[in-house]
Amino acid sequence: MKHDPQFRALTPKWHQGYRFQYEPAQKAHVVLYPEGMIKLNDSAALIGGLIDGKRTITAIIHELQQQFPNVPELGMDVDEFMEGTKKKNWIDLV
């Protein structure tokens, strides 16, 4: 699935009340929210760590492609993460 440039031009930011951080007790990155905590896998943590309310989806993909140049599906993975977290209201896309 490929997205048009308009989708990738959006800037993700964590939804109000949601916070991304490393949780030593879980030995993992998590998303904290008022009702609890979501433990992220390594891929989601890499993407989530780049959500700062300033970078566009395109910029996040570019940053990850610099770190992982031999992962051709990386853009699709980021798109799916953004779509999924938006549907769950973890992030806002502006």
Curated annotation (Swiss-Prot):
**Name this protein carries in UniProt:** PqqA binding protein
Its annotated pathway reads: Cofactor biosynthesis; pyrroloquinoline quinone biosynthesis
According to its UniProt entry, one GO biological process term is: pyrroloquinoline quinone biosynthetic process
**Carries keyword Endoplasmic reticulum?**
no
Please give the function described in this protein's UniProt entry.
Answer: Functions as a PqqA binding protein and presents PqqA to PqqE, in the pyrroloquinoline quinone (PQQ) biosynthetic pathway.
One MF term from GO for this chain? Answer: quinone binding
Signal peptide as annotated in the record: none
Transmembrane is among the record's keywords:
no
Whom does it interact with, and what assembly results?
Answer: Monomer. Interacts with PqqE.
What's the family?
Belongs to the PqqD family.
The protein's matches in NCBIfam families, at most eight in alphabetical order, are given as: PQQ_PqqD, PRK02079.1
Keywords associated with the record = PQQ biosynthesis
Q: Which organism is it from?
A: Pseudomonas savastanoi pv. phaseolicola (strain 1448A / Race 6)
